[in-house]
Amino acid sequence: XDEAAPPPAATAPXAAXTE
């Protein structure tokens, strides 16, 4: 069910850049 609830990083790639 990963597709049902993907990680926040996948939804907001920009967040990864911020980290």
Curated annotation (Swiss-Prot):
Q: Where in the cell is it found?
A: Plastid, Chloroplast thylakoid membrane
Keyword Membrane belongs to the record: yes
Entry GO CC: chloroplast thylakoid membrane; photosystem I
Question: Out of the domains of life, which is the source?
Answer: Eukaryota
Keyword Membrane attached: yes
Major site of localization recorded for this protein: plastid
The UniProt keywords, alphabetically, are: Chloroplast, Membrane, Photosynthesis, Photosystem I, Plastid, Thylakoid
Which topology term describes how it sits in the membrane?
Answer: Peripheral membrane protein
Q: What is this protein called?
A: Photosystem I reaction center subunit IV
Gene source species? Cucumis sativus (Cucumber)
